[in-house]
Every structure is written in structure tokens, then in C-alpha cells.
Amino acid sequence: MKKFLSLVLALTMMMSLVTINAGAKEFTDDEELNYKEAVDVISEISVVDGYEDGSFKPQNTLTRGAAAKIICNLILGPTTAAELHADTAPYKDVPVSNTFSGYIAYCAKEGIISGYADGSFRPAGTLTGYAF
């Protein structure tokens, strides 16, 4: 619970420093965004960057691996988070070649996230709002 509250506090502090300008990323599916201002804020500070095709896809589910990346971007900032890497596989189903392995390894080391009893993490598994 302490780590979660620390994460919320860090996010609150970061967002209080942000001003949105005309340079906020425009997603190809902006008209589908119910919370466009919030999406503008988190994309402006590079917490999320959308998909390669330029869309945000608000209807898609969030995977456990992508959640680890978002958490690292919030805590470390996107530049430092992008430099994270895993020297060894953090979980039996997360090889070092996995896109999210560095983020998952960092979050696991810091006690922010955990895997399953069988030693897996299931990075492609989806999260509910409650779990995140």
C-alpha cells in the first residue's frame, strides 16, 4: 500500500508541474477519447505514447507489461525508463528480449509488482482497473 501511495503522490506532483501547450500529441483517434485532456497530459509528459499507427485506442485493454512501462515512466521519467534493461529474465515467461523486460525487472526489484506463484508474470495478460 505504501508503494501505491508513493506512486500516486509522485504522479500528482508531476502533473502539478505540467502545462499543456499546443504541442500535445494528436492521436488519429482523438474523437474517441472521452478524457482527452487527461490523455493530453500523460502523452505530453511521455508517460504514454500510443501505438505505432498514431492511435491511442482507448477501447483496448492494458497489458501487465505495458502497465510496468507506464509505472516506470511515471517514477523515473521516460528518458531514464527507456534505458532500463534486464540482464537476466525477471520471470520465467519474460525473456530479456521481451520489450517490457527492463520495466518489469525494475518494478519487481522495487516491490511495485509481483508475478504469480508459478514463477510467471504473464506480461500479455490484461489488467482490470482494480488490479492497476
Language-model regions, residue ranges each:
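Feature responds to low-complexity, polar/acidic, surface-exposed segments characteristic
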Residues: 2-36, 49-102, 110-130
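Mature N-terminal segment immediately following signal peptide/propeptide cleavage
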Residues: 40-47
